[in-house]
Amino acid sequence: MTIAITIISSLLFLIVGLVVGSLIFKSSTEKKLAAARGTAELIVEDAKKEAETTKKEALLEAKEENHRLRTEIENELRGRRTETQKAENRLLQREENLDRKDTSLSKREATLERKEESISKRQQQIEEKESKLAEMIQAEQTELERISALSKEEAKSIILNQVEDELTHDTAIMVKETENRAKEESDKKAKNILSLAIQRCAADHVAETTVSVVTLPNDEMKGRIIGREGRNIRTLETLTGIDLIIDDTPEAVILSGFDPIRREIARIALEKLVQDGRIHPARIEEMVDKARKEVDEHIREVGEQATFEVGIHSIHPDLIKILGRLRYRTSYGQNVLNHSLEVSKLAGILAGELGEDVTLAKRAGLLHDIGKAIDHEIEGSHVEIGVELATKYKENDVVINSIASHHGDTEATSVIAVLVAAADALSAARPGARSETLENYIRRLEKLEEISESYDGVEKSYAIQAGREVRIIVEPDTIDDLSSYRLARDIRKRIEEELDYPGHIKVTVIRETRAVEYAK
């Protein structure tokens, strides 16, 4: 029974197990089917989506290909249109060129036609002239045939005249060649003589300056020289015409002026004032007068020394004094007295070499520039003034001619005059002997004073401040105060018209009236 129960139970369990197993299997199968259906649906859905995507991509590619093809076609069409347009433009340009060439050819044809007409006319004129020329030649031949009926003597005379002309020409050539050879030989001899003369004459030259320096014992003396409100320095500048420069230079005062004589007078007067110690306007006037007399005496001594140096005697005392003034005169920076002494010595040496009068040659050389001593005081060139002085003091005619001809203004009438001119050129042309800049500066200052002193009533004028100022001292009885202004204006106008100068020039007219009484 137990076994039966066990079997039944086992069968029941088996049946139940089979049923449960079948149910589980069925459920599992249904789930798998459902999962398979879901997977199939997903696959179908994905396939649809992929197909849709592929379709869209295909459409997009088709559109892009279509756009690309359209663009290529349009570009190709555009390029063809451009080429077509260019071809049309080239054709138009060719047509224009052809038109221009056609026009140019037409003009050339017209020009050629005109030239042909002109050539035809010229040819016609030439033929007419040739015809006239032939007629003239025929007429001349006829006339010559008529005239040629000469006698034997006439033909001989013509031949002799021709021979004479040829001989005269040949003789002139021979004479010219002889003259050239003589000139060459004379040039060689002259150079030899000049070289000997130069070797035997040597002179030192120092370039002149336009300033002098006065040494002071101490710097306090500068204030005394200036004076109260500058009256002392103004008085000294007015009396001498020299510009006093008082600056930071220790224990020194600089005197500036282009006239060496006035500068020397100012230097001596100032040195005497400094030595004396009493410096006031009255004392300054006294010292300037003494200095002027001292300089005049020194000028006379210098003139005598110059004549003694070259061995010249019996010169008029006044001419000796004028000669001494050359010590304070420069020409292009060369001291004129030293230059005259050098010319005198050179002329004497040259005269000795040529057998001429040595003493007379030295005399002419010494006095050849005598006019330069006073050419800034008298109208005329230094040559004209020198001739007048030599004539006035009864110098030899050879000396007078040497003065007149040493610059070629007058023809030399003697060998000595030629020698003086040569010696003058030797002395002046030596390198370093002269400086044109200083001479031009001095000439400008002299011209300033000359313009100022050309007016009536002007007593004296001084160019100072290196030519930047000209001071004119007038006669108070002749020029009143109003006339002083007018005079300054007139002088200013003449300076502007006649002079070339840098910067400005101050024109100062000084009118001073003095009333002097003596108490007894």
Swiss-Prot record:
Location of this chain's protein in the cell: Cell membrane
GO molecular function, one term: RNA endonuclease activity
Pfam families found in the cross-reference section: HD (PF01966), KH_1 (PF00013), RNase_Y_N (PF12072)
Enzyme Commission no: 3.1.-.-
UniProt keyword list: Cell membrane, Endonuclease, Hydrolase, Membrane, Nuclease, RNA-binding, Transmembrane, Transmembrane helix
GO CC list: plasma membrane
UniProt record, GO biological process: mRNA catabolic process
Domain named HD: residues: 336-429
Superkingdom to which the source organism belongs: Bacteria
Region (Disordered): 70-127
PROSITE patterns xref list: HD, KH_TYPE_1
Membrane topology: Single-pass membrane protein
InterPro entries: HD/PDEase_dom, HD_domain, HDIG_dom, KH_dom, KH_dom_type_1, KH_dom_type_1_sf, Ribonuclease_Y, RNase_Y_N
Stored HAMAP family: RNase_Y (MF_00335)
Similarity section: Belongs to the RNase Y family.
Function field: Endoribonuclease that initiates mRNA decay.
Protein's name in the database: Ribonuclease Y
Species annotation: Listeria welshimeri serovar 6b (strain ATCC 35897 / DSM 20650 / CCUG 15529 / CIP 8149 / NCTC 11857 / SLCC 5334 / V8)
